[in-house]
């Protein structure tokens, strides 16, 4: 039995990516939901304030989803998330998903994420807005919420080629790998409000999401 601890925010796509990699590898792990306002446990464990952070069996805590994925694949190589012949393409796709696609999905999901933190309390909601507006500028949250339809249309435009790609394959490159987990994490933005908001007409993408979502230690990912 492994002894791993994942420090996370539930709504973080990068944490969702790491959780699903841990599931795929059949590893036992404990999840610590970090309080958005009080990160002292995360700071004590990792020396920094960013999630995801993963405490390994050695007691070392590492941060950054790319680094975590690489270390996990080195420590627990079977099953691999980096098929040798496709490693570079998986990394390139993951960077795109965690960059341009993340920006589009984050903006499309902002109303749901604001509502999530509002449910946690006024202090959480205020701090969430403060962090976002410190990064993107004053008024960012209100402006982005008003532009929600345009943000969702942009997200759908970026997802459409992925839906087409998945018409003849179970996973992005045929065999499941890191890019699938990165995309899965980002699409979590579209489920923050509860129901999955991948358009109904994107049947291939919705089916792919279901396949990845069902992965647990006992599941054959090829099914």
Where are these predicted regions, by residue range?
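Intrinsically disordered, low-complexity polar regions and short flexible loop motifs
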Residues: 206-214
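GST-like fold's C-terminal all-alpha helical module
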Residues: 99-207
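Alpha-helix C-caps/helix-loop-beta hinges
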Residues: 51, 78, 168-169, 184, ...
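GST-like domain detector, emphasizing the conserved glutathione-binding G-site
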Residues: 1-127
């Amino acid at each position: 039995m492994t002894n791993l601890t994942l420090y996370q925010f539930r709504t973080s796509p990068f944490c969702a990516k790491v959780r699903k990699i841990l599931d795929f590898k059949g590893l036992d792990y404990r999840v610590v939901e970090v309080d958005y306002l009080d990160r002292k446990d995360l700071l004590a464990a990792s020396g920094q304030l960013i999630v995801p952070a993963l405490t390994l069996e050695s007691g070392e805590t590492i941060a950054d989803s790319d680094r975590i994925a690489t270390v996990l694949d080195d420590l627990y190589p079977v099953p691999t998330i980096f098929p040798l012949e496709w490693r570079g393409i998986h990394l390139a796709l993951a960077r795109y998903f965690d960059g341009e696609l993340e920006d589009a999905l984050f903006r499309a999901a902002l109303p749901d994420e604001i509502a999530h933190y509002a449910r946690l309390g006024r202090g959480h909601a205020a701090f969430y807005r403060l962090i976002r507006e410190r990064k993107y500028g004053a008024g960012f949250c209100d402006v982005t919420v008003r532009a929600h339809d345009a943000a969702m249309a942009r997200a759908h435009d970026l997802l459409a080629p992925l839906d087409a790609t998945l018409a003849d394959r179970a996973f992005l490159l045929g065999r499941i790998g890191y890019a699938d987990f990165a995309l899965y994490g980002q699409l979590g933005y579209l489920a923050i409000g509860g129901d999955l908001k991948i358009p109904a007409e994107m049947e291939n993408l919705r089916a792919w999401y279901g396949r990845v979502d069902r992965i647990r230690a006992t599941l054959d990912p090829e099914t």
